[in-house]
Curated annotation (Swiss-Prot):
One of its GO terms (cellular component) is membrane. This is Inactive N-acetylated-alpha-linked acidic dipeptidase-like protein 2. Glycans are attached at residues 295, 373, 534, 759. GO terms for biological process: response to bacterium. Residues 1-121 are cytoplasmic. The keyword Cytoplasm does not apply. It comes from Homo sapiens. PANTHER family: INACTIVE N-ACETYLATED-ALPHA-LINKED ACIDIC DIPEPTIDASE-LIKE PROTEIN 2, N-ACETYLATED-ALPHA-LINKED ACIDIC DIPEPTIDASE. Keywords: Glycoprotein, Membrane, Phosphoprotein, Signal-anchor, Transmembrane, Transmembrane helix. The chain crosses the membrane at residues 122-142. The lineage of its organism: Eukaryota, Metazoa, Chordata, Craniata, Vertebrata. The modification Phosphoserine is found at residue 92. The gene is NAALADL2.
Amino acid sequence: MGENEASLPNTSLQGKKMAYQKVHADQRAPGHSQYLDNDDLQATALDLEWDMEKELEESGFDQFQLDGAENQNLGHSETIDLNLDSIQPATSPKGRFQRLQEESDYITHYTRSAPKSNRCNFCHVLKILCTATILFIFGILIGYYVHTNCPSDAPSSGTVDPQLYQEILKTIQAEDIKKSFRNLVQLYKNEDDMEISKKIKTQWTSLGLEDVQFVNYSVLLDLPGPSPSTVTLSSSGQCFHPNGQPCSEEARKDSSQDLLYSYAAYSAKGTLKAEVIDVSYGMADDLKRIRKIKNVTNQIALLKLGKLPLLYKLSSLEKAGFGGVLLYIDPCDLPKTVNPSHDTFMVSLNPGGDPSTPGYPSVDESFRQSRSNLTSLLVQPISAPLVAKLISSPKARTKNEACSSLELPNNEIRVVSMQVQTVTKLKTVTNVVGFVMGLTSPDRYIIVGSHHHTAHSYNGQEWASSTAIITAFIRALMSKVKRGWRPDRTIVFCSWGGTAFGNIGSYEWGEDFKKVLQKNVVAYISLHSPIRGNSSLYPVASPSLQQLVVEKNNFNCTRRAQCPETNISSIQIQGDADYFINHLGVPIVQFAYEDIKTLEGPSFLSEARFSTRATKIEEMDPSFNLHETITKLSGEVILQIANEPVLPFNALDIALEVQNNLKGDQPNTHQLLAMALRLRESAELFQSDEMRPANDPKERAPIRIRMLNDILQDMEKSFLVKQAPPGFYRNILYHLDEKTSRFSILIEAWEHCKPLASNETLQEALSEVLNSINSAQVYFKAGLDVFKSVLDGKN
């Protein structure tokens, strides 16, 4: 195509020259020239005429004719003012050359007589016209036949049938999801995680998913030791297991898995005897208060889970000098869906990926660092009943009474001995990956992620919900694909392994294919733990995708009798979306049902992983209608991102989110506010000048749409800071929780510098945010400049 276009100007010039020779020859024909009588010149003209005819056939008649038509009467307009009315049309064997009488050397003011061969030429032209007409009619018949016999399921690229998505999603049924869920739960009772991975691969392949395969990584896992951890009261010598039961052989047999799997993966190992100091939630104010009245060096902190990321709180305790942590969940914070009598749980202290290969994939011959633990603290999760025994307090919650929080008085001393024993081993983590290849943009990926059972850990039943939902959508999608339809962009389906130990499977896969994913991933749709309650739909989305989620949720509301108002936010979430948010800057969407109590309580309780019997999915959603709703909402978002010509991302919403994060009385933000205003202006200009015209089908030039989509998919990458506090997102567009509306790294820095007149940490955080906003503003401006230069080039 490029070569053809490049040759057009040369073809035009050559044609013009040859036409010049042709007319010259015609004027020299015997009996028709009043000026030239030389026989040699006449023979030369006839030779030139033959050469011109041959070259015309080689260069292409259509191109030549088009080019000639465009330049008609333009060739000498700069040098000669022609009296066109006085020029009679010349007649030549090829009438398209009559314009060349206007050449300055051949201007005549007489009427030429018709050549003798006119009748023959007329017959020749008539034959061409008849042939062209027959071919045209034949082409119409072929087109009609092909159109009527093509599958009606495949709409043309660039147009989206509004009923297409509903046709795919209507095949998703709650009963099918329930059946799949029960099969998975039953499978978990009898087989290990590798067998479950094989079942998932077999099922996805049978549904028609393309190139379904295992992607395995050998990683370092921190597994439970041969015997459960213990906590012993020094005053009485009583020994307790993490669930509060006295240490005994009988207790171990009755609940062996609960006892073993109630641990903190990647904690330090060993024994520590020290005083227990209640630090509540471990906030900055809590630690300042405690350190004023007690020496905390090498002591044991009694810490509540929630309000801030666990890794951040442990980092603060480690810096303060603590030696161990007894971690628990206040019964007053527990959602109704969790039975407080079974609140043993597991946590992972791994920020993500294989700890022995930080930042690079665990492939063959990779260098492995020696990191059996990720903290110097001995960390042990314990139940609320055990906490009550440690502080000599009655139970915190009774059936009909109000809840009272557990609290150890500061004037009382409790000394305990805690023993933590885990084992680190190299194990294989398996991901299952398959895809549906895109039709027009196969190199652009929408990744849909669920996770499957992980051995040696608490998994509850959330993994079965996650897997059943992604399988239900694959079944619905492939039924359409088998009838000839394909999405414009490639949809990649992933079932991650090792999620409980720190999203290891997704991190390793992301690090393995980082260069490809950085360039090609458009969005990530998370199906992690979709049913955590049954009272409220709780969507989480990147700022650029919130408008799309609102539209889909409102449409879903019109189909249901009850639909309470839904708050859509960009907050930190658990699960395998972590790598895509914090290392690739990819927009994400996640739908989940929550318990109202959970939403009202402290955030980050979801960092705890409860046992199977503590969370009963079928009790929360007996009809599986909630599962069906999550599948359809997620599916509709997937289809729209995968199939719309213009990505349904909103640039202006990012700028508005930045401005909202800077509202209120915040110190040292005047520069940030000024930069945020410039970002908004650039985003508004980009939205009005580029995005709105692109939504008009008449303006959808393929190269222009591709350029626009490339800009849209990389918008959030500007907001990845180099380093964030432990447990905080590197992507600063995400808040800590729904109760905060400011940049999380600024909140942490302000808390850190409260007692100080000036603080380097605050200045560094302000600089990070300023650079991110400036980078985004420059990015939008550069995008506008690219479009402008392309338009100027065309003009």
